[in-house]
Every structure is written in C-alpha cells, then in structure tokens.
Curated annotation (Swiss-Prot):
Entry keywords, A to Z: Amino-acid biosynthesis, Aromatic amino acid biosynthesis, Isomerase, Tryptophan biosynthesis
EC id: 5.3.1.24
Pathway given in the UniProt record: Amino-acid biosynthesis; L-tryptophan biosynthesis; L-tryptophan from chorismate: step 3/5
One Pfam family linked to the record: PRAI
InterPro entries: Aldolase_TIM, PRAI_dom, RibuloseP-bd_barrel, TrpF_fam
UniProt name for this protein: N-(5'-phosphoribosyl)anthranilate isomerase
Organism expressing this protein natively: Petrotoga mobilis (strain DSM 10674 / SJ95)
Record-linked SUPFAM superfamilies: Ribulose-phoshate binding barrel
Any one GO MF annotation of this record: phosphoribosylanthranilate isomerase activity
Domain of life: Bacteria
Length: 207
C-alpha cells in the first residue's frame, strides 16, 4: 500500500480535513518558505490531530540546537532534512529521519550513497535552481530506476491527480508527497484535489 504525505501544512482547518481524507503523514515546513510555519503553531495544530497521523518536521541545514528543540517538542515522528546537511547532524537525530535528494539528472543519484546506511527514508524531489521543494515540477522518474536505494523512498515533485498514477506505476515508491499541485495558493490546500489524488492512488492495481 502506498503511503501518502501532504506537505506544507500551515493551519488547523487544512490539517483536520486532510487527516480525515485518509493521509498517513503531514509535513510542517520549519525552514524559510512561503509555507513556513512556526513550531508554536505546529504545537497548536497537533493537539487537534488524530494520533495515527504522523507529523514530519521539514528543515533545511539546521543547527544542532534546532534539532534538539524539535526533539524536545514531542510533536514530531520524523525529521525531513531538505538541504545539504552534514551527515553527523542526521545520524545524531533521535527521531526517524528522511533525507531529501533533489534530482536534476543522473549525477544527482551520487548523493544517495552518503546517506544509504543510516537514514530511515529517502525523499526524491525536483531540483530547480536553489529552490527548496514546492517547485510544482516533476523530474524524469526513469532516472530513479538506475539508483542504488537501500531504504524505502518517498516520491515528491509536482505530483497531482493527473500524473500520480503514472508516477506510481513507473517507479513504485513506498510513499508519495503532495504539496504545491494540491493547493489553492502556497500554504492553503485544496481538499478537493487531495481527495481526488487519494482516490486515484487507491484505484491503482500494480501487477
């Protein structure tokens, strides 16, 4: 079964409605982004969520103190590292870890070997300049077929109701990450598009 994460949650209404729609995880971006949310707001949102929905803290090149603050909050199940972090800060994280690898071409796959032995999950996103996720663009999924991936992985990057089935059938990820293509505007999700995407995922029959 494909797990579903929706990233860029900024408000209680979206968090509750998306949780009810049947997703597995919500992503909260704590780094600079149009979808940035303060940790205090995540604490507020988290109190309204059902316990079976995982919470993911999305960070970019955090210092040790930021990770310790996330750990002490007792809110999150995972930390998603979306920058060019030193391996030690990921290794020392006490929560489950997701390492984002931004894909531009085949050479992007070289990054995987740095983290293969200790992260819990990989997330593959589209590289567009220096943007940190939320680009709304897909990458060439065929590239991942040549990757030496030892861990479960999440597919991100421009996923929508229109392309989600093809994406899953092409590379068979363990999970998908929805963001900019299921929004009304940055930080405000379109629950109709999310439900439509979930329905299409649930309809897939992979041989």
């Amino acid at each position: 079964m494909i797990r579903i994460k929706v990233c860029g949650i900024t408000n209680i209404e979206d968090a509750i409605n998306i949780s009810k729609a049947g997703v597995d995880a919500l992503g909260f971006i704590l780094a600079e982004s149009p979808r940035k949310v303060e940790l205090s707001k995540v604490l507020e949102i988290s109190k309204e969520l059902p316990p079976f929905v995982s919470r993911v803290a999305v960070v970019v090149n955090p210092v040790k103190e930021e990770i310790e603050k996330i750990e002490r909050s007792k809110v999150f199940d995972y930390v998603q590292f979306h920058g060019s972090e030193d391996v030690n800060i990921i290794k020392n994280c006490k929560l489950k870890t997701i390492k984002a690898i931004k894909i531009e071409n085949k050479s992007s796959l070289e990054e995987i070997s740095k983290y293969n032995d200790f992260v819990d999950y990989f997330l593959f996103d589209t590289k567009i300049g220096e943007k940190i996720g939320g680009t709304g663009h897909t990458f060439n999924w065929e590239i991942l077929k040549e990757a030496n991936i030892k861990k479960p992985f999440i597919l991100a990057g421009g996923l929508s109701p229109e392309n989600i089935v093809e994406a899953i059938k092409t590379i068979r990820p363990n999970a998908v990450d929805l963001n900019s293509k299921v929004e009304l505007y940055p930080g405000k999700k379109d629950i109709r598009l999310i439900k439509e995407t979930i329905d299409r995922i649930n309809s897939i029959k992979i041989k």
